[in-house]
């Protein structure tokens, strides 16, 4: 289409998902336009460049094996990946003490805690295996699990306080919310569609294995450059009107665009900023009121030298202390060893609690906990500090992703990506693989673009959903479990076994005593 402001498809949102959709449409000979509310592309990815940091990812940054779509895009853009350092030991900080370790999860020396931890991960993966990626509301136990919070599930399956405490951190780290806030069905689905508990939490061979050299915003900027003037910045969408032959979209700056189809590539809750004519269907209208965003402040502390590596630590800290602002850290030093830095997340309840502090106060508290965990005075003397509070972002509403409270997924989940007339829905929340990550954003954007192409008669329906070949540069390795990890009983199972054993021994002893005449009938 050549008329001014008239296109084949309007894409709302210039993050990775929206740009992926527009890129694919353009490659297939269609005419898309991208309307982005901010003065930049990238959405929940945000790379800042300055003298102190060279560059720093204040938003989405991590990528790993099985995230093949975002890796393909990066390769097309000439963006290389670098491994997050995990050569030295990690540190688990609990009850005021630091415990160095190697591997994905901290080891447990208490046998009851070990059984409890092992059963927790095994149980979550077992439950997740029942949940269909494409339709979690169709799981055999969907209704039961959706009425339950993750806190209720943890209370049900965990016997020890240490397992419950770490399980809470596991939810905080992965979805920036609290166990009492999220549906068990939704969280179990979320972990499953990321490849399971090991894949989602691990650095090496997991979701945090790598970053993009030069920052993740390069990928959005590369796609935007390819689209050229089709990307309109500072164009928040105010109104979507489907009543005419063409869909009309109006922005806050009073620009009007027309197209045959529209792809909405924003977090679901941001649909509330748009006025729809005709009104959205009842379930879609209620869905967008019911899926809040997670809460996180991403913090990067810079130091004169990499003192933690000199002490034999890689920079990863798993911190279990209520007063500590940070729950998880990763090394953020540049691959050539320059600009030594530690990245940490202020998560969920702690994010909400510490939002009221000044930036300087947050930095001070972060440095203090790093000093205690690493046992180093040097941690108290940073040379620079960067942070990004995603809760204050008007056009994100939070990070990393939207979460589903109890009861929502089974009642409203089926309309999450269901088209409304000529409106189609993208955004990482609508993905079925690595939802919440950059990978999910690409899958969702390209799927929505293919839905439009199918509706236009350009592709068969069978081509809407497509698998992605594995990345050659970043292959996925299987996680190998030991015999004991597969067969170690839960605490409850062990207690039942002991009780049954004691009962059996007592019964056998009684029978023997009776046979020998040691017991007589009265």
Swiss-Prot record:
Localization annotation: Mitochondrion outer membrane
Pfam family, one: Amino_oxidase
Protein's membrane topology: Single-pass type IV membrane protein
Principal place of residence: mitochondrion
Molecular function terms, GO-annotated: flavin adenine dinucleotide binding; monoamine oxidase activity; primary methylamine oxidase activity
Keyword Zinc: no
Modification type S-8alpha-FAD cysteine: residues: 399
Keyword annotations of the record: FAD, Flavoprotein, Membrane, Mitochondrion, Mitochondrion outer membrane, Oxidoreductase, Transmembrane, Transmembrane helix
Domain of life: Eukaryota
Annotated positions for site Important for catalytic activity: 158, 367, 384
Record SUPFAM superfamilies: FAD-linked reductases, C-terminal domain, FAD/NAD(P)-binding domain
Mitochondrial intermembrane side: 514-522
Topology, Cytoplasmic side: 1-492
Similarity annotation: Belongs to the flavin monoamine oxidase family.
Functional note: Catalyzes the oxidative deamination of biogenic and xenobiotic amines and has important functions in the metabolism of neuroactive and vasoactive amines in the central nervous system and peripheral tissues. Oxidizes both 5-hydroxytryptamine (5-HT) and beta-phenylethylamine (PEA).
Protein name: Amine oxidase [flavin-containing]
Source organism: Oncorhynchus mykiss
């Amino acid at each position: 289409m050549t008329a001014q402001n008239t296109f084949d498809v309007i894409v709302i949102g210039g993050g990775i998902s929206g740009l992926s959709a527009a890129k694919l449409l353009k490659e297939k000979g269609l005419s898309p336009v991208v309307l982005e509310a901010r003065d930049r592309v990238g959405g929940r990815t945000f790379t800042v460049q300055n003298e102190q940091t060279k560059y720093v990812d204040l938003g989405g940054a991590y990528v790993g094996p099985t995230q093949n779509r975002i890796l393909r895009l990066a390769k097309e853009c000439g963006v290389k990946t670098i491994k997050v350092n995990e050569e030295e030991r990690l540190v688990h900080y609990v009850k005021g003490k630091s415990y160095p370790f190697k591997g994905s999860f901290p080891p447990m020396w208490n046998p009851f805690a070990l059984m409890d931890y092992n059963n927790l991960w095994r149980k979550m993966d077992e439950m997740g295996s029942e949940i269909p990626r494409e339709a979690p509301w169709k799981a055999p136990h969907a209704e039961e699990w959706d009425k339950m919070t993750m806190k209720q599930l943890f209370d049900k399956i965990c016997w020890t306080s240490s397992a419950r405490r770490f399980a809470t951190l596991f939810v905080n780290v992965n979805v920036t919310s609290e166990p009492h806030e999220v549906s068990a069905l939704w969280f179990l689905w979320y972990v499953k569609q990321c490849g399971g508990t090991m894949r989602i939490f691990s650095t090496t061979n997991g979701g945090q294995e790598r970053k993009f050299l030069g920052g993740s915003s390069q990928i959005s900027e590369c796609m935007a450059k390819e689209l050229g003037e089709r990307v309109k910045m500072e164009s928040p969408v105010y109104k979507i009107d489907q009543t005419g032959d063409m869909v009309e979209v109006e922005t806050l700056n009073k620009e009007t665009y027309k197209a045959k189809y529209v792809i909405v590539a924003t977090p679901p809750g941001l649909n509330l900023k748009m006025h729809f004519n005709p009104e959205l269907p009842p379930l879609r209208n209620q869905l967008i009121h019911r899926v809040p965003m997670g809460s996180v402040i991403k913090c990067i502390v810079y130091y004169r030298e990499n003192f933690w590596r000199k002490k034999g630590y890689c920079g990863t800290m798993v911190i279990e202390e209520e007063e500590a602002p940070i729950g998880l850290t990763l090394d953020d030093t540049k691959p050539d060893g320059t600009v030594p830095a530690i990245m940490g997340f202020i998560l969920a309840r702690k994010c909400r609690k510490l939002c009221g502090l000044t930036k300087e106060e947050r930095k001070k508290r972060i440095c203090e906990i790093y000093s205690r965990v690493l046992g180093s005075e040097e941690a108290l003397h940073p040379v620079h500090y960067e942070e990004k509070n995603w809760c204050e972002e008007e056009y994100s509403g939070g990070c990393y992703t939207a979460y589903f409270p109890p009861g929502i997924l089974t009642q409203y989940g089926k309309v999450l990506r269901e088209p409304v007339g000529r409106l189609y829905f993208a955004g990482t929340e609508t993905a079925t693989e690595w939802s919440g990550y950059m990978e999910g954003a690409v899958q969702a954007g390209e799927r929505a673009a293919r839905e439009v192409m199918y509706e236009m008669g350009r592709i068969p329906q069978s081509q809407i959903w497509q698998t992605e070949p594995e990345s050659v540069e970043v292959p996925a390795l299987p996680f190998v479990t030991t015999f004991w990890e597969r067969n170690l009983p839960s605490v409850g199972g062990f207690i039942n076994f002991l009780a049954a054993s004691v009962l059996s021994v007592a019964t056998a002893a009684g029978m023997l005593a009776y046979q020998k005449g040691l017991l007589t009938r009265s």
